[in-house]
Amino acid sequence: MSNIRLFFSDNILENTTSLLSKEHTHYIVNVMRLKRGSNINFFNKEGEWLSEIVFLERDRVEVKFLNKIKESSITSNIELAICLVKKTPMEIILQKATELGVSRITPIISERTEVKELNLERAIKITVEATEQSNQLNPPVINKVTKLKDFISNINQDKKLFFADINSEYRMKPADIKKNQSISILIGPEGDFSSQE
């Protein structure tokens, strides 16, 4: 059985110990039922480390970081700008976008968007869990909810924006994207963009 992977936001140094958060402690003790001496892989944007549980009680777990097993990787320059949808579909979108390696997610409000808020704490939790499960190192950055017109006006000239327009004659070609170019993929609301948008 492979080691479980957990996101660790603090810096990790080899041969140091760390007391884990209540959330990680609960997961290790009550959900995974690991024992002292068990190995866990911790990761962050700097890489992935093998650790060993050196102290374990019901409400306290301490690990020792043994060695770095994976170097940090180059993150993609892909932003998913998506109009907010209902809770369950939005959570699936956050999960799948993370698994596909999107580096940034920007929730958008357009004229026809029915949902106006995103629970940022929940969204971050979903993306961190998806990062743990998909063997990635970097959860995507989740930007604050932004109005469509503000998002469009702040697009950098170096960034390529893609969106579907059923009335357009233009069809995207692979040559439209240069290697390592920043791109944004804009997904409209359930009722499509308004004619003014």
Annotated model-derived regions:
Residues 48, 88, 170-172, 193:
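Glycine-rich nucleotide phosphate-binding loop and flanking beta-alpha elements
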Residues 18-19, 75-79, 181-183:
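Glycine/charged-rich beta-loop-alpha catalytic/anionic-binding loops adjacent to active sites
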Residues 167:
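Carbohydrate-associated surface elements
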Residues 175-197:
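A glycine-rich beta-strand to alpha-helix segment
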Residues 71-163:
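RNA substrate-binding interface of SAM-dependent RNA methyltransferases
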